[in-house]
UniProtKB/Swiss-Prot annotation:
Its main location: membrane. It comes from Streptococcus equi subsp. zooepidemicus (strain MGCS10565). It is a peripheral membrane protein. GO terms for molecular function: ATP binding; metal ion binding; protein-exporting ATPase activity. This is Protein translocase subunit SecA. One of its GO terms (cellular component) is plasma membrane. May bind 1 zinc ion per subunit. Its EC number is 7.4.2.8. Its cofactor is Zn(2+). ATP binds at residues 85, 103-107, 493. One of its GO terms (biological process) is protein targeting. It catalyses: ATP + H2O + cellular proteinSide 1 = ADP + phosphate + cellular proteinSide 2. Monomer and homodimer. Part of the essential Sec protein translocation apparatus which comprises SecA, SecYEG and auxiliary proteins SecDF. Other proteins may also be involved.
Length: 842
């Protein structure tokens, strides 16, 4: 073990020596750059661009370019990057992560690699976790870039597509991680090239990279559309039933946070809904609503997992930052179940049109780099998933913060009493205190106790984060007491007020350990910036969430040794801190394994998404006739249909092929079995294909000119691709839930998902080609639409393309015995089974 540790330390030292060598080269240009006039310094940008065009690499330009930015920052901002910041900038340019402590000037460090990479003219994206930081950094650092002749854009959610396009065309674009992801998805849903806003993804520099690429790695970005639904009453009824249950009627698995009805709960459900068997196929919709109502009532907690806004909206709380996640909703009906639980307006269910995780979004950039103060604990994940190394950068001044040993109490009550007493003592001597909590609920509780103790304070949590930067800025003033959820206010420095250094600097008090050591380190790092004095102290109790879920038997043994009559007794032990850390490592390991598994599943979707999006983009950007592609689809559709039916006896095969031809290729009265009898399969294929080509030419002759034909072809393909892709996303989601159970049969769920997902993708491609064929052959192209065929709108597309073949008679005699809840209903209504006959009993 010690050999491995020594090797790691030596590797880090060797890396730092290399960085220092390049940094000294940058510093060697300092006097020369200082001697240049403003005009000459600004002229360096076009000079570098020309040299890059002439074949010099960015690595060759680096020392000089970094020196130019240093001098420009000194003249424009009055700030001059230190050597450690130059080293951090080199690491960023190499596509790695410099671990730089809080207050070491990460924002200024980024200016050097951002400027250098912007010289290539392919765009640089600086990614931050919220719009406040994007706007602040773009405004402050943008002065340097603008002064040096580079354009800077800010991409905000509220901007129009035209404004977004302009922002992305700039040399440097500031944006949030979510907005870049949503823009990528929306770009792959448009029908005209001019509606796209992004350029190809080149270089992203992610601020607080651990927050985006680790904490939010599993978060899918979802673009969805509302599905018309009459399910609100069903959510309310399921909620009313679940609220009648006793604790023996359901079973909760605490570590995995899963829940299900017990036998007594099933009996109650059957009685409440007047059913003979809750798990009968006909009740598949009902079990879905009941499962969600159970989760909403007994797993999802108000002020921890979500808050209710003043407007009566359910807002998700980010478990890592404590911020509310505006515009995000729990999926698969859970959000509606929570709305029913809280008695607020139930919003419509939505259907996913496009989705991507941050893991796959950021892996699409040609080069990816990031900055953070705490990433070493996740080094393996950064290396394996993103191919990024973590390089710890030394601080400019030694750290003077004192980190005290954790204090452990028996109960939550005794722990909070001790926290309030500590805060009061420090407040009375004027030392500023930042109290960090894991949940909104805890911050409200401590706030209440501080009010009772007569201590004035500010609360920063998911309920009022719009004031967060202001509150955090004042947290270092004399006598300031601030309560903050987790890492709220991250990215904003806490500067010490007058006389605070003499009092010991800012004291950070953690009210419990987070399940990730990194988050605890971030909280500690709020104190002691740039060599300032400071303190940190964590208070724990045996009733904390981490202890209850993952505490070891050795920790629990402490409780037995305690004097139960005196709950205020406190344990202070290094060994205890190590035990807590090992519990955290276990959780981090579990979380990493989960993220790795999510990535394995998501890679299946990624490969398929890239194929669909590449083909889609090819259609959108096409200036050529798409006839060859459409004809190839028609040919494959005919071949598939004939091959599929030729396996039955010949008479039945001919009848089936005739039915296919009548419904999908030719006018009904123009073909009969007689015509095809006696022909071989290849002859039938050729005959049908020739007939299809005649109809194809006839259809296109109704359109005004070549532009109208191209627009029609594009709309035809894109409309069907988008529709089928949306259905496929939903189907993959259901498959993923289903294969999880196959582990019990000794089958690897990921392998099963990959093979079945591939087969479903092949089927989807076949379905796209079939629908393109059928719609092309059967569409009614109205005379009055000719003049408007070049003006795309989804409504025009729907008017231009009205397929006679789509839709079948309602079949009330269908067999429902083997139908899954997300399958198409056998009655041919066009709805999913769960939204049609699967709902009937409910």
């Amino acid at each position: 073990m010690s050999n491995i540790l020594r090797k790691v330390i030596e590797n880090d030292k060797g890396e730092l020596r290399k960085l220092e060598k390049i940094a000294k080269k940058v510093e060697s240009y300092a006097d020369y750059m200082e001697s240049l006039s403003d005009k000459d310094l600004q002229a360096k940008t076009p000079e570098f661009k020309q040299r890059y065009q002439n074949g010099e690499t960015l690595e060759q330009l680096l020392p000089e370019a970094f020196a130019v930015v240093r001098e420009a920052a000194r003249r424009v901002l009055g700030l001059y990057p230190y050597r450690v910041q130059i080293m951090g900038g080199i690491v960023l340019h190499n596509g790695d992560v410099p671990e730089m402590r809080t207050g070491e000037g990460k924002t200024l460090t980024a200016t050097m690699p951002v400027y250098l990479n912007a010289l290539a003219g392919k765009g640089v994206h600086v990614i931050t976790v919220n719009e406040y930081l994007s706007t602040r950094d773009a405004t402050e650092m943008g002065e340097v870039y603008s002064w040096l002749g580079l354009s800077v854009g800010i991409n905000l959610a509220a901007k129009s597509p035209a404004e977004k396009r302009e922002a992305y065309l700039c040399d440097i674009t500031y944006s949030t991680n979510s907005e870049v992801g949503f823009d990528y998805l929306r770009d792959n849903m448009v029908v005209r090239q001019e509606d796209m806003v992004q350029r190809p993804l080149n270089f992203a520099l992610v601020d607080e990279v651990d927050s985006v690429l680790i904490d939010e790695a599993r978060t899918p970005l979802i673009v969805s559309g509302a599905v018309s639904s009459e399910t609100n009453q069903l959510y309310i009824r399921a909620d009313m039933f679940v609220k009648t249950l006793d604790s023996v009627d359901y079973i909760i698995d605490v570590p995995t946070k899963t829940i299900g009805l017990s036998d007594s709960g099933i009996d109650k459900a059957e009685s409440y809904f007047n059913l003979s068997n809750l798990y009968d196929i006909e009740n598949v919709a009902l079990t879905h609503f009941v499962d969600n109502a159970l989760r909403a009532n007994y797993i999802m907690l108000l002020d921890i997992d979500y808050v209710v806004s003043e407007e009566g909206e359910i807002l998700i709380v980010d478990q890592f930052t404590g911020r509310t996640m505006e515009g995000r909703r729990f999926s698969d009906g859970l959000h509606q179940a929570i709305e029913a639980k809280e008695g607020v307006r139930i919003q419509e269910e939505s259907k996913t049109s496009a989705s991507i995780t941050y893991q796959n979004m950021f892996r699409m950039y040609k080069k990816l780099a990031g900055m953070t103060g705490t990433a070493k604990t996740e080094e393996e994940e950064f290396r394996e998933v993103y191919n990024m190394r973590i390089i710890p950068i030394p601080t400019n001044r030694p750290i003077a913060r004192i980190d005290h040993t954790d204090l452990l109490y028996a109960t939550l009550n005794s722990k909070f009493k001790a926290v309030v007493a500590d805060v009061k003592a420090r407040y009375e001597k004027g030392q500023p205190v930042l109290v960090g909590t894991v949940a909104v609920e805890t911050s409200d509780l401590i706030s209440k106790k501080l009010v009772e103790a007569g201590i004035p304070h500010e609360v920063l949590n998911a309920k009022n984060h719009f004031k967060e930067a202001q509150i955090i800025m004042n947290a270092g003033q004399r006598g300031a007491v601030t309560i903050a959820t987790n890492m709220a206010g991250r990215g904003t420095d806490i500067k010490l007020g007058e006389g605070v250094r003499e009092l010991g600097g800012l004291c950070v008090i953690g009210t419990e350990r987070h399940e990730s050591r990194r988050i605890d380190n971030q909280l500690r790092g709020r104190s002691g910036r740039q060599g300032d004095p400071g303190e940190s102290q964590f208070y724990l109790s045996l009733e904390d969430e981490l202890m209850r879920r993952f505490g070891t038997d050795r920790i629990k043994a402490f409780l037995d040794r305690m004097n139960h009559d005196d709950e205020d007794i406190v344990i202070k032990s290094r060994m205890l801190s190590r035990q807590v850390e090992s519990a955290q490592k276990r959780v981090e390991g579990n979380n990493y394994d989960t993220r790795k598994q999510v990535l394995q599943y998501d890679d299946v979707m990624r490969e398929q998404r890239e194929i669909i999006y590449a083909n889609r983009r090819d259609v959108i950007t096409a200036n050529r006739d798409l006839g060859p592609e459409i004809k190839a689809m028609i040919k494959r559709t005919i071949d598939r249909a004939v091959d599929a039916h030729s396996r039955t006896n010949r008479k039945d095969a001919i009848d089936a092929i005739v039915t296919f031809a009548r419904t999908s290729i030719v006018p009904e009265e123009t073909i009969g079995a007689k015509e095809l009898r006696g022909l071989k399969d290849d002859q039938i294929k050729d005959k049908l294909y020739q007939r299809a080509l005649e109809i194809y030419d006839k259809q296109l002759s109704k359109l005004r000119d070549q532009d109208a034909i191209l627009e029609f072809q594009k709309v035809l393909i894109l409309m069907i691709v988008d529709n089928k892709w949306t259905e496929h996303i939903d189907a993959l989601d259901q498959l993923r839930n289903a294969v999880g159970l196959r582990g019990y049969a000794q089958n690897n769920p990921v392998v099963e998902y990959q093979s079945e997902g591939f087969k479903m993708f092949q089927d989807m491609i076949g379905a796209i080609e079939f629908d393109v064929t059928r719609t092309m052959m059967k569409a009614q192209i109205h005379e009055q639409e000719r003049e408007r065929a070049t003006q795309y709108a989804t409504t025009t597309a729907a008017q231009n393309i009205q397929s006679q073949a789509i839709g079948a008679d309602f079949d009330s005699s269908a067999d429902f015995s083997r139908v899954e809840r997300n399958d198409a209903c056998p009655c041919h209504s066009g709805k999913k089974f769960k939204n049609c006959h699967g709902r009937k009993a409910f």
